[in-house]
From Swiss-Prot:
Catalytic activity: 1-(5-phospho-beta-D-ribosyl)-ATP + H2O = 1-(5-phospho-beta-D-ribosyl)-5'-AMP + diphosphate + H(+); 1-(5-phospho-beta-D-ribosyl)-5'-AMP + H2O = 1-(5-phospho-beta-D-ribosyl)-5-[(5-phospho-beta-D-ribosylamino)methylideneamino]imidazole-4-carboxamide
Record lineage: Bacteria, Pseudomonadati, Pseudomonadota, Gammaproteobacteria, Vibrionales
Any single GO BP term: L-histidine biosynthetic process
Pathway where it operates: Amino-acid biosynthesis; L-histidine biosynthesis; L-histidine from 5-phospho-alpha-D-ribose 1-diphosphate: step 2/9; Amino-acid biosynthesis; L-histidine biosynthesis; L-histidine from 5-phospho-alpha-D-ribose 1-diphosphate: step 3/9
Record's keyword terms, sorted: Amino-acid biosynthesis, ATP-binding, Cytoplasm, Histidine biosynthesis, Hydrolase, Multifunctional enzyme, Nucleotide-binding
Enzyme superclass (EC): hydrolase
Name used for this protein in its record: Histidine biosynthesis bifunctional protein HisIE
EC number, UniProt record: 3.5.4.19, 3.6.1.31
Family: In the N-terminal section; belongs to the PRA-CH family. In the C-terminal section; belongs to the PRA-PH family.
Molecular function as annotated in GO: ATP binding; phosphoribosyl-AMP cyclohydrolase activity; phosphoribosyl-ATP diphosphatase activity
A single cellular component GO annotation: cytoplasm
Primary localization: cytoplasm
Entries under InterPro entries matching the protein: His_synth_HisIE, HisE, PRib-ATP_PPHydrolase-like, PRib_AMP_CycHydrolase_dom, PRib_AMP_CycHydrolase_sf
Gene3D superfamilies in UniProt: MazG-like, Phosphoribosyl-AMP cyclohydrolase
Amino acid sequence: MSFKAAEVSSLSERINWEKVDGLVPAIVQDFQSSQVLMMGYMNQDALAKTGETGQVTFFSRTKERLWTKGETSGNVLQLVNISLDCDNDTLLVRVNPIGPTCHTGTTTCWDGDAQEESQMVWLHQLEQLLAARKSADPDSSYTASLYARGTKRISQKVGEEGVEVALAATSGDKAELVCESADLIYHLLVLLQDQGLSMNDVVNKLKERHK
């Protein structure tokens, strides 16, 4: 039994399955961006299979069977962790989504409502775009050309943009400071991706220092 399966088994034992009529709501959240992706229902078997396979599986109330998200589309939800709420009757399932989550092709099942994107969600989407550019033709974009030139050049650009930010601040030009800060953050994100890291790693370090 894997660690995830053992952890899920322990969670299952805390759920009063009789109280919830055999089904618990499972809220699915993107682990990186914290964006809520969808909601489904799990019975004991669906929860167990999720832990065993590492891919989120629900119980379909209409088809009356287990179904693994993405079993036909390939847009699976890779399990990161699961937690129970304080009443032990609702699951929060954190995942790494592979492709769009909604069957309509949108990122979440609420995208059709034109919900306002949070800043962190947009930043995560930018990181995904930058990650995709790593394997792109160097002539196809500035980002791809940066990756092709290697870590030394990317690091140099981060240094240059840092100086530009400092100069903009000392000049008192706030509009220029915003523009130069955007350039710095962009190049820093490229450098993090180049090193196999993300902004989440930086945020986690900040949280650690704040404790």
